[in-house]
């Protein structure tokens, strides 16, 4: 495994007001004189210099006239400052969420390519938190718990008492990602019933025969099929759920793909 470190991101950022102050000092102006030239109060200029108030379009126009740099320059400076500020604030939040990683199968997610492979050391953990947020598509661990903890789905588990919520949620999300890449017609109940009858006739066939035919039959009936390798500690054989009112998903973990257990799980979920 190639071990990467998190990308460099400085933990400091200068407010655009620093540039305003530098240009004013080059001209030998005090903050009071600068305020007078810009038509602002000294308090407002002090807040602008210290990053307490943003450079608005109006302020950028005034700075262009008084200090010479273009309005676009000042607005871009402000936008970059706000972006870096937001990134630093997010990093601080991520530091508070590091314990969330203990609930997730981070190693398995890295191995599967779901999140980037980096060394799972203290300095990289905030970045891993961000990768996991993006993978699950949630704003914070609280939303993750609310979404995946409250999902009303019918699980078939091999060991209920040993199942891990973090591992199950990761497996479910991997299935969602597979489904997101699939398209097809809306769900057709009659076609699905017909598909199940034909699929029952495939149970004695090897995977290379039954799998493509099975996918085609389900696709034509508007049913998505996701075969997702099992994740340790999830102990989930299969799950059936609706991703939307017209998009049902059957997700199987490939436990016993070549024996009766695979088919038992499929027909249980179907």
What are these regions, as identified by a protein language model?
Residues 2-29:
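A short, Lys/Arg-rich alpha-helix, primarily the initiator
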Residues 21, 32, 61:
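Residues within the helices of the helix-turn-helix
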Residues 24, 49, 59-60, 67, ...:
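DNA major-groove recognition helix of helix-turn-helix
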Residues 32, 43, 72:
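Key DNA-contact positions within bacterial/archaeal DNA-binding proteins
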Residues 38-64:
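Recognition helix of helix-turn-helix/homeodomain-like DNA-binding domains
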């Amino acid at each position: 495994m190639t071990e990467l470190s998190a990308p460099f991101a400085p933990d400091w950022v200068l407010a655009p007001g620093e540039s305003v102050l530098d240009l004013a000092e080059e001209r030998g102006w005090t903050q009071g004189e600068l305020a007078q030239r810009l038509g602002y109060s000294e308090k407002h200029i002090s807040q602008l210099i210290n990053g307490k108030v943003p450079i608005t379009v109006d302020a950028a126009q005034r700075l262009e006239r008084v200090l010479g740099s273009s309005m676009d320059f000042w607005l871009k400076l402000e936008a970059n400052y706000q972006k870096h500020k937001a990134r630093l604030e997010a990093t601080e939040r991520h530091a508070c969420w590091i314990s969330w990683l203990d609930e997730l199968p981070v190693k398995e997610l890295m191995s599967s390519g779901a999140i980037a492979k980096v060394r799972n050391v203290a300095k990289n953990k905030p970045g891993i938190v961000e990768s996991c947020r993006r993978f699950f598509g949630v704003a914070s661990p609280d939303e993750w718990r609310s979404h995946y903890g409250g999902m009303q789905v019918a699980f078939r588990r091999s060991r209920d008492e040993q199942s891990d919520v973090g591992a199950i949620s990761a497996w479910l999300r991997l299935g969602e990602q597979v489904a997101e890449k699939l398209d097809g017609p809306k769900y057709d109940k009659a076609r699905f019933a017909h598909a199940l009858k034909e699929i029952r006739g495939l149970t004695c066939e090897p995977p290379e025969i039954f799998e493509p035919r099975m996918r085609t039959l389900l696709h034509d009936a508007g049913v998505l099929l996701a075969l997702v390798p099992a994740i340790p500690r999830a102990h989930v054989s299969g799950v059936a759920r609706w991703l939307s009112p017209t998009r049902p998903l059957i997700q199987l973990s490939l436990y016993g793909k070549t024996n009766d257990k695979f088919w038992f799980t499929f027909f249980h979920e179907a």
